[in-house]
Amino acid sequence: MSDAKQVFSPAQRSLLTGVINRIIPPKDDMPGAGSLGIAAFIEDAAASTTSWTRLFNEGLAQIAVAAGQGSDHGFENLSNTAKDELLRSIEVANPVFFDQLILQTYNGYYTKPEVFELIGYEVPKPAPPGAYPELLDVSLLDQQRNRKPFWKKV
């Protein structure tokens, strides 16, 4: 992330990291979204337009206020159950923000080569110059269709 695209304060980045670690928490050998630097991916997305910058700043402020940020409390000091309840309340109160937060978290997470490797996908090799792409072999999706969900239902 370049300095020109910084739209979150250090406190907001820390809060965002904690929040996205609840959206995609670490499980077994899969890392949580916060530990992969997805907050920077989300900040880049938020910086793309002024309306998104406002949406994410207001949404993070809502989470901070609801968690008692600025006091001895705060999001990170809540139990996981309390964090999840707080995020559910934000989802109801500000669905546009929450939908974008989820979307950008998943976009950032599932485009990381480390995640591709851990879930068993091979990153395709680049085609040589001038080559035409082959049509999708839908049987390649069988592996995904047949596996158990590895995401957290909320």
Cite the ranges covered by each PLM segment.
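An acidic intrinsically disordered interaction segment
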Residues: 1-2, 73
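N-terminal module-boundary/linker segments of secreted carbohydrate-active enzymes
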Residues: 2-10
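Mature-region segments of soluble proteins
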Residues: 14, 18, 22, 30, ...
